[in-house]
Amino acid sequence: MAADLDPLTPAYEAMGVEGYYLAHGATYRNPHEDGVRGALTMAVATWTLDLSRVLDLACGSGEATLALRELGADRIDGIDPFTGVAYQARVGQSAEALRFEDIAAGALGGRTWSTVVCSFALHLVETSRLPGVCQALAEITDSLLIITPHKRPHIRSGWGWQPPVECKFQRTRARLYRRVGAESNSFGMASL
């Protein structure tokens, strides 16, 4: 049934995730863009998110970047090892070509973002690599917003993050994690 919900599942199964993006990264478009946009809009309306400097992690062709721009973010950096051509063509800026394993190894050390958004990608990280990626992200931001079509990934508090709060737009979930020990550990509610 998962294949019915995600049109990319058969391609991932046939080619592997990396193989798919190596073959199609330059022309990639997330088939769930409306869900990404809706979930981001709902997240910004529901929680107090600092959008002063955002990292769009696994930025694809810019689905989250474009939605975040519409929501008031104007300093957005993109990272994706496969879709840089598609991102550049669509949003007019380059994406840094880093892999999750590069991030786990400290490639982003010394840099900070107010919020990191990872849309439809963190659940694809190998389970053995996920703790290192999460711990590295906890060193560069206080807020991690994961946009996902399901309840994965499962991030443990020992990896640097508090249990999340969640909102849902249609079938797309927005899960906000705050870094353990962050200056503001609250999940402030936006004024409505």
Each PLM stretch: what is its role?
Residues G106-V116:
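A short acidic, Gly/Pro-enriched loop at the edge of an enzyme's catalytic core
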Residues P131-S143:
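A short glycine-rich, Lys/Arg-flanked "PGG" loop and its adjoining helix->strand segment in the class I
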Residues T141-R152:
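Conserved beta-strand signature within the Rossmann-like core of class I S-adenosyl-L-methionine
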Residues T172-L192:
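Core SAM-dependent methyltransferase catalytic element
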Residues S157-R179:
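Conserved Class I S-adenosyl-L-methionine
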Residues L55, S61-A105:
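Class I SAM-dependent methyltransferase SAM/SAH-binding core
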Residues S114-S128:
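A short SAM/SAH-binding and catalytic strip from SAM-dependent methyltransferases
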